[in-house]
């Protein structure tokens, strides 16, 4: 995930949603 942001640490559901 993390298509919007390069952070797949825990914001993979944050920036998108």
From Swiss-Prot:
Keywords: Amidation, Neuropeptide, Secreted
Major localization listed first in the record, in broad terms: secreted
Tissue expression as described in the entry: Expressed in abdominal perisympathetic organs and abdominal ganglia.
Coiled-coil portions: none
Keyword Transmembrane: no
Residue positions where Leucine amide is found in the record: 17
InterPro entries given in the database record: Pyrokinin_CS
Gene Ontology terms: cellular component: extracellular region
Annotated GO MF terms: neuropeptide hormone activity
Subcellular location, record wording: Secreted
Function recorded in the entry: Myoactive.
Protein family membership: Belongs to the pyrokinin family.
Record protein name field: Pyrokinin-5
Organism: Rhyparobia maderae
């Amino acid at each position: 995930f993390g298509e919007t942001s390069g952070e797949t640490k825990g914001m993979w559901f944050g920036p998108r949603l």
